[in-house]
Structure formats: structure tokens, C-alpha cells
A protein has these predicted regions:
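Short, solvent-exposed loop/turn positions at domain surfaces
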Residues: 84, 127-128, 135
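A short, N-terminal "cap"/entry segment at the start of jelly-roll beta-barrel domains
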Residues: 18-83, 171
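Conserved metal-binding segment of the jelly-roll/cupin
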Residues: 131-152
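Short, surface-exposed beta-strand-loop junctions and turns on beta-sheet-rich folds
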Residues: 103-105, 156
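Bacterial N-terminal signal peptides
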Residues: 4-16
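Short, conserved beta-strand element in jelly-roll/cupin
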Residues: 82-97, 101, 109-123
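A short hydrophobic beta-strand segment most commonly corresponding to one strand
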Residues: 153-170
């Protein structure tokens, strides 16, 4: 897991070096023990997507979020009206994730607590791409793209990396 996490941090950092206006910190560390403890402490009866750490890395921000999603609550498909990309890294569990397509019966769900930008949900996604997701998989979902879990075979635990070129996420 550490190699994958380090690779994701490097990839996100290298892609925006030219856009930096201030020097980045020497490093931001999150150990596997810290990540496991954080996700273990999330409620088991709700969909939890909470920030473990958000860092200003020199001209933009990067958030690392821990997610627990119980099997019986896959949740509706959603869309975040933002330029913040979401990079999922699956830790445990399996399910089917759909991305793209059209959000059917789209409705506002208010502003995101992470970015302050509008969020939307729907009853389903038509014409999207579905894939089975297992531990170790990485899925990159650009901002403003419909996405959602259509089914969960088990409870799932994953990390979301959110590179934020606009600096919308509060540092934590």
C-alpha cells in the first residue's frame, strides 16, 4: 500500500510543479497505521467520506480522505460541480462503480463541505461505464463527472485523493 500511496502523491505533485507559486512542504506523511485507525473510527451505519489530511503543497492543495461505505448503503450516483479530481484507491471490499453518462432525475444536494461548490445526486446513471472494483484498484474520476456505486458485494473501505488546483479545500 505504501508504494501505491507514494506513487500517487508523486504523480499528483509532478503534474503541477510548473503551476506552483510557493515552495511545497518537504513532505506530508500518513502511515498505514494512521489510515487504518482513522477509517476504523468512522461510523459503520453510514456512508463516511471524511478528510484525513488536506495540505497546501505550493500553489494548490491535496486532500486525502478516508471512506467507509456499508454494503447496505451504496448511495445514489452523484456529481460534484468542481475542478477537483477524485482518485480512489481501494483498500478492502468489492463492488461495481459507474462513471460518466447522464445523471437521471438530477437534483441539488447542497454545497460540498469540502469545496463549497454545488453537489448533485440522481436516481441512476444512464450510458456510463461500469466496472467491478477490488482491493488495490485505482480509479481516477475528473471533477464534474457523474459517478456512483451501483452495488456493493461487501462493506468497502477506500482512500480518495483530491488534488485541488483552485485551493477550495480547507487545510486540515
Amino acid at each position: 500500500m505504501r508504494v501505491v500511496l507514494a506513487t500517487l502523491f508523486v504523480a499528483v505533485g509532478v503534474s503541477t510543479v510548473a503551476a506552483q507559486s510557493s515552495p511545497p512542504p518537504p513532505a506530508v506523511d500518513l502511515t498505514a497505521i494512521q489510515i487504518d485507525a482513522f477509517i476504523d473510527a468512522l461510523p459503520e451505519d453510514a456512508i463516511s467520506d471524511r478528510p484525513i489530511r488536506v495540505a497546501d503543497v505550493g500553489g494548490y492543495k491535496v486532500g486525502v480522505y478516508g471512506v467507509f461505505r456499508p454494503q447496505e448503503l451504496p448511495g445514489p450516483p452523484i456529481r460534484h460541480e468542481t475542478s477537483v479530481t477524485e482518485i480512489y484507491y481501494m483498500l478492502s471490499g468489492t463492488g461495481t462503480l459507474v462513471t460518466g453518462g447522464t445523471l437521471v432525475e438530477e437534483r441539488s444536494t447542497g454545497n460540498s463541505p469540502n469545496t463549497g461548490r454545488p453537489n448533485f445526486a440522481g436516481s441512476r446513471v444512464e450510458g456510463g461505464v461500469s466496472r467491478r472494483v477490488v482491493p488495490g484498484d485505482v480509479i481516477i474520476i475528473p471533477g464534474n463527472v457523474n459517478h456512483g456505486w451501483t452495488s456493493l458485494d461487501t462493506d468497502i473501505r477506500y482512500l480518495i485523493f483530491r488534488p485541488d488546483p483552485e485551493g477550495l479545500q480547507p487545510v486540515r
